[in-house]
C-alpha cells in the first residue's frame, strides 16, 4: 500500500505547501504501514535523492520527460533520462553514499 504526495503540478492547489516541504511529516505519520511516493517538483536527480533521504520510497514526475519528448522526441527523452541518471550518480558520489539505502535525513539541510 502506498500514498502519493502531490500538489498536481501546482495547478490544483497553488497555495498549498510543496510535497517535499511536508514529506518528512507524512512519512513519520504513516510509519512503516504505508510507502510514501513523492510527486511534484521532481525535475533533477538531486530532487530524487532529497525525497528519498526525507523518507520517500519512490518519486514520480512527468514534466521532465514530457518537455524532452515535445522538444526532441524519443531522442530527447533518452538524453533526458541519461542526464537524470548521471545527476543521481554524481550527487551520490559527492555525498559519499554508495547505495540509496544509505540516504537519511541527517544529510538534508532545511532552511
Language-model features and meaning:
Residues 1-26, 30, 71:
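Glycine/Thr-rich beta-alpha phosphate-binding loop at enzyme active sites
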Residues 21-111:
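Alpha/beta catalytic cores of nucleotide-metabolism and tRNA/nucleoside-modifying enzymes
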Amino acid at each position: 500500500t502506498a500514498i502519493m504526495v502531490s500538489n498536481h503540478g501546482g495547478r490544483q492547489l497553488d497555495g498549498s505547501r510543496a510535497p517535499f516541504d511536508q514529506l518528512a511529516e507524512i512519512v513519520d505519520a504513516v510509519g512503516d504501514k504505508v510507502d510514501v511516493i513523492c510527486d511534484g517538483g521532481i525535475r533533477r536527480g538531486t530532487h530524487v535523492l532529497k525525497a528519498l533521504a526525507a523518507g520517500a520510497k519512490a518519486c514520480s514526475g512527468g514534466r521532465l520527460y514530457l518537455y524532452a519528448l515535445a522538444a526532441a522526441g524519443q531522442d530527447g527523452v533518452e538524453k533526458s533520462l541519461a542526464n537524470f541518471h548521471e545527476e543521481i550518480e554524481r550527487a551520490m558520489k559527492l555525498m559519499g553514499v554508495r547505495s540509496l539505502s544509505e540516504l537519511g535525513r541527517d544529510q538534508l539541510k532545511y532552511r
